[in-house]
Amino acid sequence: MRTDRDNWDINTSVGSTALFVAASRALEATKPAPLAADQYAEVFCRAAGGEWAELVAGGVPEHPLRSEDFGQYFVSFQGARTRYFDTYFGKAIEAGVKQVVILASGLDSRAYRLDWAPGTTVFELDQPLVHQFKREALDQHGAEPKAVRAEISVDLREDWGKALQDKGFDPSEPSAWLVEGLLIYLPADAQERLFESIDQLAAPGSFVGIEQMTTYADVVFAMLVAGANESGDQANSDFFSLIYNEQRSEAATWFRCHGWDSERTELLDYLNFSGRTLPEPSQPAWYMFNSISLVSAVKG
């Protein structure tokens, strides 16, 4: 159960979801034609050890990420989501943006993967123990970032704007923001404050990329929670205990109303466009995927 001031490392609470997602990206990268190839996802899993290291080594056949009714689709989802936001950042790079802010950066490796313009700084905001795990894993692997990387240890439910500026962020210059895999772990009022902070800190010409998950109807949410608990799948049960299923602002509309040119792509449409098999409406993955949209916007 979440509390207003809970915190975590890479193995607990919200932090543990980063390993689940990294493992998905690692499995996607092994496909003959991956939607995205994150070479560092496997590094994180091996550094975590245990089932994560075994999974990327080809073991743990019963792992939820190998299941036919959910796992195979979730792996494709992570490939699609990664590709979408990699492409989004490519547009920001082409526009000359040299300030990048990744909120709840987790095990995001874009500071190491993408070809940033010289002079770019990637600001990564997350819990201190998450930063520590990521830094140590990449250092041991000998990885070198392709931009200046600035770690900011902060709770995104609090005022993080000052901490960002203290690290050298300049609100008078354009920036590119990423809100990926975050909003469902925030209460609705915290999301509102997050959007307001981005808008206040972003100069004209700035970009924002957001993953949005529509609130489930109460009856659907109760059904999904009951199904997760009955399945014995601890990861699935934990997911529903971590998220806030609250009515909240729709991202594309919010930013459009605040002077941004925004566009929204439904995840199912993007997966279909990418040539991936979609889950059937009777499968658990369908309820999740049908509620997810990918948003990008540019500030006028």
UniProtKB/Swiss-Prot annotation:
The keyword Cell membrane does not apply. InterPro entries: Ppm1/Ppm2/Tcmp, SAM-dependent_MTases_sf, SAM_mthyl_Trfase_ML2640-like. Its EC number is 2.1.1.-. GO terms for molecular function: methyltransferase activity. One of its GO terms (biological process) is methylation. This is Putative S-adenosyl-L-methionine-dependent methyltransferase MAB_4328c. Keywords: Methyltransferase, S-adenosyl-L-methionine, Transferase. SUPFAM superfamilies: S-adenosyl-L-methionine-dependent methyltransferases. The keyword Amino-acid biosynthesis does not apply. It comes from Mycobacteroides abscessus (strain ATCC 19977 / DSM 44196 / CCUG 20993 / CIP 104536 / JCM 13569 / NCTC 13031 / TMC 1543 / L948) (Mycobacterium abscessus). S-adenosyl-L-methionine binds at residues 126, 155-156. Belongs to the UPF0677 family. Exhibits S-adenosyl-L-methionine-dependent methyltransferase activity.
